[in-house]
Design a protein with these regions (language model features):
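Residues forming the flavin
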Residues: 1-18, 30-526
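ABC transporter nucleotide-binding domain catalytic core, centered on the Walker B motif
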Residues: 23
Length: 526
């Protein structure tokens, strides 16, 4: 566990330091970052214990569970989202230090009620895309989010995103850059540090301002629920020991908190999340020993799997994790027991040990966080819509498009006139974004030998059709075209000048440049 000081993509901020006491011992953290990051950097991964005394650490890492709750200056707070700034003392919650006989006196406070057309719970890509479209349709909205920044999961994403667009906007941009643009310049009506704790009768939403410790209410004609998802953790022996983390924890700590939880990683799950977190771990200075996948084939996008192969990371299909091997004091792990499997059942006699690891990165999917959606549908009826991962787990592209689509649906329920063709177009794009990559070509096209000898050229290792076309915008000569999500990009080698702009703009790192005259090869390396 260490602080990341150099990164090929991210700019490491140089903030001041702040020292606080953890269980009576001084710990120094960086201002503007969480208590969880400070404790891990100081070598304290244990934050709580089970009822029978087992060491516990972070679980979701994004403020959606109570696994990291500790006493922070006498108040129960989640250390994964609580900054170290001005904190004096942090300690584990025990029966001894949390039992109190004091009575809490009720406070007389004026009731604050905000009224709007549409309330949006969640300031992630789906919620903010919905807000933008509602604004274009002439509807007011209030956005409520428990985090201190807008952007949701995009804030943790350093990779470039796939988008199929008619006009270039988000395609090829990195997640944290997209997060900065989603709300535009006008952030009015966005309430951060605010948690929705109930949806009441008469379409009233109860909210707590966690920063100022006060309650307020939002009354709206319609409701959008963009609450995202929570990580799914499979069960295996010692799945609760520190060193076993979900991808959300690994990614949040690495890309948002600049904290590397380990140097030698075993990833479980060969899907897009497994590929991307493994790739980002390598960028941050860790070594990924292997990726396990219980299915007999790889998941995710083939271009993402290929970028992993180019780094030399092996992908073992039909393999599952049986056990995490803890160290002597159970504050970390030293290895894992894996085996071959069939239909998600272990095959006896195939067990083997992968040693020399200090983190298991669990990338086995997400579960929609849809409790508020369920209650919202009871209260608002058809005027309640779910967007993003709250209704269907998908890519960031899908979340943005669903947010836009839902805005039109809510506008229709509120009898607001709009161009229906625009709604149909967005709906088609949303459906297309769910498309699993379909293999179109067997091998990458190449120019004729005569053209190869004339000037530099590129080849596309993009053999599958799916919703992505940033390469077509990257080419200044318009030599790359892609007519739909069901085809692969086509290169006009007569127009291609070999400028290599497309090599660095492909989100899947799937374009390679060649200059046979000078024997040069241009690789997509980040």
């Amino acid at each position: 566990m260490e602080r990341i000081v150099n990164h090929p993509i991210l700019t490491i901020p140089q903030e001041g330091e702040h020292t606080f006491l953890f269980n009576g011992k001084p710990v120094t953290g960086m201002k503007g970052f969480t208590i969880a990051a400070a404790l891990h950097q100081a070598g304290y991964p244990v934050h709580s214990h089970s009822v029978n005394g087992r060491n516990r650490s972070l679980n979701c890492g994004i403020g959606k569970c109570g696994a990291c709750e500790m006493l922070v200056d006498g108040e129960v707070k989640r250390i994964c989202i609580t900054k170290v700034d001005n904190v004096k003392e942090v300690s584990e919650i025990t029966v001894q230090n949390y039992t109190t006989d004091s009575q809490i006196e009720p406070r007389e406070e004026p009731v604050e009620i905000y009224r709007t057309d549409v309330a949006i719970i969640g300031a992630g890509p789906a919620g903010l895309a919905c807000r933008e479209t509602l604004k274009e349709l002439g509807l007011n909205s209030i956005v409520i989010d428990s985090n201190d920044k807008i952007g949701g999961q995009f804030l943790m994403q350093t990779h470039a995103f796939f988008f199929f667009e008619k006009e270039r906007r988000f395609g090829g941009m990195r997640g944290f850059d997209i997060a900065k643009t989603l709300a535009g310049d006008d952030h009015s009506g966005i309430f951060l540090h605010s948690t929705v704790w109930d949806i009441l009768q008469n379409k009233r939403i109860a909210v707590k301002d966690m920063l100022n410790h006060k309650n307020f209410y939002v009354e709206a004609q319609a409701l959008i629920v963009a609450t995202g998802a929570v990580p799914f953790m499979p069960t295996f022996e010692n799945d609760d020991v520190p060193g076993v983390y979900t991808a959300a924890v690994v990614q949040k700590m690495m890309n948002a908190e600049f904290t590397l939880l380990g140097k030698n990683i075993l990833t479980v799950g060969a899907g897009n999340i497994g590929y991307l977190t493994s790739y980002q771990l390598m960028q941050a200075g860790a070594k990924v020993k292997a990726i396990l996948e219980a299915m007999p084939h790889e998941g995710g996008f083939p271009v993402q799997a290929n970028r992993i192969r180019r780094l030399g990371i092996p992908i073992y299909t039909s393999h599952m994790l049986l056990k995490a091997i803890p160290n002597l004091d159970r504050t970390g792990i030293t290895g894992a027991v894996v085996c071959e499997c069939e239909n998600f059942k272990p095959i006896p006699g195939t067990e083997k040990v992968i040693d020399g690891i200090d983190v298991i990165n669990i990338c086995t999917g997400l579960i929609p966080d849809n409790q508020l959606l369920t209650k919202g549908q009871y209260t608002f009826g058809k005027r309640c819509a779910g967007v993003g991962d709250a209704v269907r787990i998908g890519e960031g592209t899908t979340a943005v498009l669903r947010g836009k689509q839902a805005a039109y649906e809510i506008a229709q329920e509120l009898a607001v006139r709009f161009n229906y063709n625009e709604y149909l177009q967005i709906s088609k794009q949303y459906i297309d974004s769910h498309q699993h990559p379909i293999r179109i070509k067997e091998e990458s096209p190449r120019p004729t030998p005569e053209r190869q000898a004339q000037r530099p050229f590129v080849r596309l290792d993009c053999l599958y059709g799916f919703a992505c076309n940033p390469c077509s915008f990257a080419c200044p000569q318009k030599a790359i075209t892609k007519s739909s999500t069901s085809v692969t990009p086509e290169i006009n080698y007569e127009k291609c000048t070999g400028c290599m702009q497309c090599v660095s703009h492909c989100p899947g790192l799937a374009i390679f440049g060649y200059d046979t005259r000078k024997q040069n090869l241009f690789l997509p390396v980040e």
